[in-house]
């Protein structure tokens, strides 16, 4: 009788088969290295035996392959030695090339020399961290607990505060306008504290350290000669690097369009810069820099790991890309930490847009410095406006890791960066068209309403020039330049910073071209100090159109926290706007005029082919000087470019 019960299928393991194949392959390679091959007609020994005991006969064809197999085996055994030899030869060749380049023309090889030094510093740091990292960490931790007691910390803070006050009192004796900028910082901080969510919970350690780091960075960049030269050099290198965009855009759009049309001249720079940033992220360089900046701010300010990483990332990426660095942790972050994330996004600009603003002619070193200085200031002011009252889960950086993207190779990373920028470029172009059209409509409507009550020339810019004039003055801008700066602040706040920087570039171009300062009752350009302070004040995404961008980006990552994001987004926007204003005030305290004095006698007593800012300044001295100190040649040169009563 047949058994109807189904038989259980027996599992068959292929592991012995695999091991057998591996053994046969290894045995076969060993025989090949000996130059032998089993003969086709070889028979097994009497009494049986395995195939491995067959009679092997030499074979000339396999003997010819013996050197190749031996070389392969040698490389496999000593691959690490060959790797070190290759690295040594390449390093020696590179060092020799660098030495020859520096000996021939050091200024020409300066960029390569600086890059080499930076790479060597990174390599030395990683080597020391690998060898002595744990020991140094224990030593520093021990010293911190034993020496830096509470009274010593307070004493150091008091000494630092008194030092700043003493320095300001001595430094502002020659330039009183710096005191106005200092008063502006105090006013802005008082206003932010008045609007704080939890006044008694403010972490003054985070506020003081954040503002202190911002001041030290500004002091290094603006006041010290090495810092100023370094950032000026870095800005020049970025400008040269971005000029290579013209090769690609000229091929696609044509040289005529690239030179004459704004969209084809500026927007391709964003594509190129986004591609480069994507490559740097793939290589891990950006993550390394972000981690080190975040570590410095976290150690000094006592903030959590996630919020500090997001703010540090905002130095290089936009308000929607920086939260991606901490995307897995957004759901568990406190409201104060989310407020920091939003404030950091509003207080800085994206690295891709940095290239576009530099192409406008905006001072590159000021843009770079403003982006770096805004990071600690954003943390400080955010903790002032929305202090931490909950228990954070991310006090330690353990378990918090940065992603390296999904690209599999360098080419894919570059291609992905260029593809991502298409959406950014389209968004910028669409916003420019929409906002400029809306601005023109608003101005036309305001002018129409103003004509009804005999107010001529009423416009959005005119209203902003009156409403925001006190803000511009508190930044440290001269009163005669305040209306123009207030207009730009209004455009940045109610439209976007792209339009504001474009307007600022036009004022700067007119100044450099030597245009007259006033054309009727309208100012044609502003002073260099006002340009620098405005550059700092406009450096941020804090405008009302960014509210939707911020909410859309964060909500798409964590939909369940939509109500939390909506609750604090407006407060974060205002805080981000104040970060840019405080940044401008710090620049106003530290800014000193630089440049070589122009010899007006030598400049004007020769034929001048075109006007410039230096020519205008010298001609203004000629028109104001009633004596014959400059001579008729100087007066003739000035009257060729400017109309003045003296010329008649």
From Swiss-Prot:
<dbReference type="InterPro" id="IPR011642">
    <property type="entry name" value="Gate_dom"/>
</dbReference>
<dbReference type="Pfam" id="PF07670">
    <property type="entry name" value="Gate"/>
</dbReference>
<keyword id="KW-0812">Transmembrane</keyword>
<feature type="transmembrane region" description="Helical">
    <location>
        <begin position="148"/>
        <end position="168"/>
    </location>
</feature>
<dbReference type="GO" id="GO:0015389">
    <property type="term" value="F:pyrimidine- and adenosine-specific:sodium symporter activity"/>
</dbReference>
<feature type="topological domain" description="Extracellular">
    <location>
        <begin position="319"/>
        <end position="339"/>
    </location>
</feature>
<dbReference type="GO" id="GO:1901474">
    <property type="term" value="F:azole transmembrane transporter activity"/>
</dbReference>
<feature type="transmembrane region" description="Helical">
    <location>
        <begin position="202"/>
        <end position="222"/>
    </location>
</feature>
<dbReference type="GO" id="GO:0005829">
    <property type="term" value="C:cytosol"/>
</dbReference>
<keyword id="KW-0813">Transport</keyword>
<feature type="glycosylation site" description="N-linked (GlcNAc...) asparagine">
    <location>
        <position position="605"/>
    </location>
</feature>
<feature type="topological domain" description="Extracellular">
    <location>
        <begin position="223"/>
        <end position="265"/>
    </location>
</feature>
<feature type="topological domain" description="Cytoplasmic">
    <location>
        <position position="361"/>
    </location>
</feature>
<comment type="function">
    <text>Sodium and pyrimidine nucleoside symporter of the plasma membrane that imports uridine, thymidine and cytidine into cells by coupling their transport to the transmembrane sodium electrochemical gradient. Also transports adenosine, an atypical substrate transported with high apparent affinity, but low maximum velocity. Therefore, exhibits the transport characteristics of the nucleoside transport system cit or N2 subtype (N2/cit). Involved in renal nucleoside (re)absorption.</text>
</comment>
<feature type="transmembrane region" description="Helical">
    <location>
        <begin position="471"/>
        <end position="491"/>
    </location>
</feature>
<feature type="transmembrane region" description="Helical">
    <location>
        <begin position="266"/>
        <end position="286"/>
    </location>
</feature>
<dbReference type="GO" id="GO:0016607">
    <property type="term" value="C:nuclear speck"/>
</dbReference>
<dbReference type="InterPro" id="IPR018270">
    <property type="entry name" value="C_nuclsd_transpt_met_bac"/>
</dbReference>
<dbReference type="GO" id="GO:0016324">
    <property type="term" value="C:apical plasma membrane"/>
</dbReference>
<dbReference type="Pfam" id="PF01773">
    <property type="entry name" value="Nucleos_tra2_N"/>
</dbReference>
<feature type="transmembrane region" description="Helical">
    <location>
        <begin position="340"/>
        <end position="360"/>
    </location>
</feature>
<comment type="similarity">
    <text>Belongs to the concentrative nucleoside transporter (CNT) (TC 2.A.41) family.</text>
</comment>
<feature type="transmembrane region" description="Helical">
    <location>
        <begin position="572"/>
        <end position="592"/>
    </location>
</feature>
<keyword id="KW-0769">Symport</keyword>
<keyword id="KW-0472">Membrane</keyword>
<feature type="topological domain" description="Cytoplasmic">
    <location>
        <begin position="130"/>
        <end position="147"/>
    </location>
</feature>
<feature type="topological domain" description="Cytoplasmic">
    <location>
        <begin position="553"/>
        <end position="571"/>
    </location>
</feature>
<feature type="topological domain" description="Extracellular">
    <location>
        <begin position="105"/>
        <end position="108"/>
    </location>
</feature>
<dbReference type="Pfam" id="PF07662">
    <property type="entry name" value="Nucleos_tra2_C"/>
</dbReference>
<feature type="topological domain" description="Cytoplasmic">
    <location>
        <begin position="197"/>
        <end position="201"/>
    </location>
</feature>
<feature type="transmembrane region" description="Helical">
    <location>
        <begin position="362"/>
        <end position="380"/>
    </location>
</feature>
<feature type="transmembrane region" description="Helical">
    <location>
        <begin position="532"/>
        <end position="552"/>
    </location>
</feature>
<feature type="transmembrane region" description="Helical">
    <location>
        <begin position="176"/>
        <end position="196"/>
    </location>
</feature>
<feature type="topological domain" description="Cytoplasmic">
    <location>
        <begin position="449"/>
        <end position="470"/>
    </location>
</feature>
<feature type="glycosylation site" description="N-linked (GlcNAc...) asparagine">
    <location>
        <position position="625"/>
    </location>
</feature>
<dbReference type="InterPro" id="IPR008276">
    <property type="entry name" value="C_nuclsd_transpt"/>
</dbReference>
<feature type="topological domain" description="Extracellular">
    <location>
        <begin position="169"/>
        <end position="175"/>
    </location>
</feature>
<feature type="topological domain" description="Extracellular">
    <location>
        <begin position="492"/>
        <end position="531"/>
    </location>
</feature>
<feature type="transmembrane region" description="Helical">
    <location>
        <begin position="109"/>
        <end position="129"/>
    </location>
</feature>
<keyword id="KW-1003">Cell membrane</keyword>
<protein>
    <recommendedName>
        <fullName>Sodium/nucleoside cotransporter 1</fullName>
    </recommendedName>
</protein>
<dbReference type="GO" id="GO:0031526">
    <property type="term" value="C:brush border membrane"/>
</dbReference>
């Amino acid at each position: 009788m047949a058994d109807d019960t189904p038989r259980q299928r027996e599992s068959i393991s292929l592991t012995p088969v695999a091991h057998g194949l591996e053994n046969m392959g290894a045995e076969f390679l060993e025989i090949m290295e000996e130059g032998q091959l089993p003969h086709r007609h070889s028979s097994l020994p009497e009494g049986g035996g395995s195939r491995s005991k067959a009679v092997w006969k030499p074979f000339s064809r396999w003997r010819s392959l013996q050197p190749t197999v031996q070389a392969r085996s040698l490389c496999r055994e000593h691959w690490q030695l060959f790797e070190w030899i290759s690295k040594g030869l390449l390093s020696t060749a590179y060092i020799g090339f660098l030495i020859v380049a520096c000996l021939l023309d050091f200024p020409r090889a300066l960029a390569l020399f600086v890059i080499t030094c930076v790479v060597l510093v990174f390599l030395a740091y990683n080597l020391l961290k690998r060898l002595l990292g744990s020991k140094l960490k224990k030593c520093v931790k021990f010293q911190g607990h034993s020496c830096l007691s509470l009274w010593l910390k307070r004493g150091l803070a008091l000494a630092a505060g008194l030092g700043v006050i003493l320095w300001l009192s001595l430094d502002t004796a020659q330039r009183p306008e710096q005191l106005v900028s200092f008063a502006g910082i105090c006013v802005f901080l008082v206003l932010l504290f008045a609007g704080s969510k939890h006044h008694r919970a403010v972490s003054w350690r985070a506020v003081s350290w954040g503002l202190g780091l911002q001041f030290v960075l500004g002091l290094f960049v603006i006041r010290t000669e090495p810092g100023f030269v370094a950032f000026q050099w870095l800005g020049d290198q970025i400008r040269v690097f971005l000029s290579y965009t013209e090769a690609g855009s000229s091929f696609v759009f044509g040289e005529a369009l690239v030179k004459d049309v704004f969209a084809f001249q500026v927007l391709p720079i964003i594509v190129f810069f986004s591609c480069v940033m994507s490559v740097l992220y793939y290589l891990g360089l950006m993550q390394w820099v972000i981690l080190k900046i975040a570590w410095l701010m976290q150690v000094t300010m006592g903030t959590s790991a996630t919020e500090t990483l997001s703010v540090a990332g905002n130095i290089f990426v936009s308000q929607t890309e920086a939260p991606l660095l901490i995307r897995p942790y957004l759901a568990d972050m406190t409201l104060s930490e989310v407020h920091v994330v939003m404030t950091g996004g509003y207080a800085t600009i994206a690295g891709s847009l940095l290239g576009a603003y530099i192409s406008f002619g905006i001072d590159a070193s000021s843009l770079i410095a403003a982006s770096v200085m805004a990071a600690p200031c954003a943390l400080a002011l955010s903790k002032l406006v929305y202090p931490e009252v909950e228990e954070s889960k991310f006090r330690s950086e353990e378990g918090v890791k940065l992603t390296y993207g999904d690209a599999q190779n360098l080419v894919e990373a570059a291609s992905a960066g260029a593809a991502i920028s298409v959406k950014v470029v389209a968004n910028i172009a669409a916003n420019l068209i929409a906002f400029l059209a809306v601005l023109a409509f608003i101005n036309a409507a305001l002018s129409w309403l103003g004509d009804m009550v005999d107010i001529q020339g009423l416009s959005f810019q005119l209203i902003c020039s009156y409403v925001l004039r006190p803000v511009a003055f508190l930044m440290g801008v001269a009163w005669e330049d305040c209306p123009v700066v207030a207009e730009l602040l209004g455009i940045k706040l109610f439209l976007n910073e792209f339009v504001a920087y474009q307007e600022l570039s036009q004022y700067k171009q007119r100044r450099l071209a030597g245009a007259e300062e006033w054309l009727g009752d309208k100012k044609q350009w502003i002073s260099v100090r006002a340009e620098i302070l405005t550059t700092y004040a406009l450096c941020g995404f804090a405008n009302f159109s960014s509210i939707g961008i911020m909410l859309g980006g964060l909500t798409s990552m964590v939909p369940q926290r939509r109500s939390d994001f909506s609750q604090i987004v407006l407060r974060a926007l205002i805080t981000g706007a104040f970060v840019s204003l405080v940044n401008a005030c710090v620049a106003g305290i530290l800014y000193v005029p630089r440049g070589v004095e122009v010899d007006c006698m030598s400049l004007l007593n020769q034929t001048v082919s075109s006007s410039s800012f230096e020519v205008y300044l010298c001609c203004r001295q000629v028109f104001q000087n009633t004596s014959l100190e400059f001579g008729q040649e100087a007066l003739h040169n000035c009257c060729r470019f400017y109309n003045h009563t003296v010329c008649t």
